[in-house]
Regions:
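Short loop/turn motifs that connect adjacent beta-strands in outer-membrane beta-barrel proteins
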Residues: 21-28, 54-64, 77, 93-98, ...
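Predominantly the C-terminal beta-signal and adjacent terminal strand-loop region
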Residues: 23-30, 61, 114-150
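Transmembrane beta-strand segments that form the barrel wall of outer-membrane beta-barrel proteins
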Residues: 28-38, 63-74, 98-109, 126-137
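Residues that define the transmembrane beta-barrel architecture of outer-membrane proteins
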Residues: 28-30, 41-45, 62-64, 77-83, ...
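Residues on the lipid-exposed face of transmembrane beta-strands in outer-membrane beta-barrel proteins
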Residues: 32-36, 47-53, 70-72, 85-89, ...
Length: 150
């Protein structure tokens, strides 16, 4: 099931390789997100912020953001707080579609976590909807959420 979801996101992301577009993430841009999802580790609920650090490279469509993430992993047996710094490489294949690949570095409960993730957000003006898939301490999962540009 997870492989099918990742394949679907990849296909949607790469459909518009030849499209001309302005960057959805740019230097100085702040994006806030609220997310909920699924995971082998528990139900993830969280907020994230990404700040455009560098933009305008790779034909004007590439950008790098840095930020942070705060979340909860809820299950019948436990609740874990997560806190992480995050960094992303963004590339806009299709106008208004922000695709990104990145890393989170921080804590889940009392454990150190290094999380790789792949995501996409589609914007309707300043507001967007998104999907993100990743791994946290060998627990696969994903989130859906809403985002806003500031």
């Amino acid at each position: 099931m997870r492989k099918k979801l990742l394949l679907l996101v990849a296909i949607i992301s790469f459909l518009g390789l030849g499209a001309q577009a302005q960057s959805t993430m740019s230097k100085g841009q702040l994006v806030g997100s609220v997310k909920v999802g699924f995971s082998d580790y528990g139900l993830p609920i969280g907020v994230a912020a990404d700040y455009g650090f560098v933009s305008g490279f790779i034909n004007g469509k590439g950008a790098v953001s840095v930020g942070g993430e705060l979340g909860l992993y809820l299950s019948n047996e436990y609740t874990h707080l997560s806190l992480a710094a995050r960094g992303n490489f963004h590339y806009e294949f299709v106008q208004n579609l922000d695709t990104y690949l990145g890393l989170n570095l921080g804590l889940v409960g009392r454990s150190f976590a290094l999380n790789g993730h792949l995501g996409a957000r589609y914007y309707f003006g300043k507001f967007g909807v998104g999907l993100e898939f990743g791994m946290v301490n060998h627990a696969a999962g994903g989130t859906i959420g809403v985002s806003m540009k500031f």
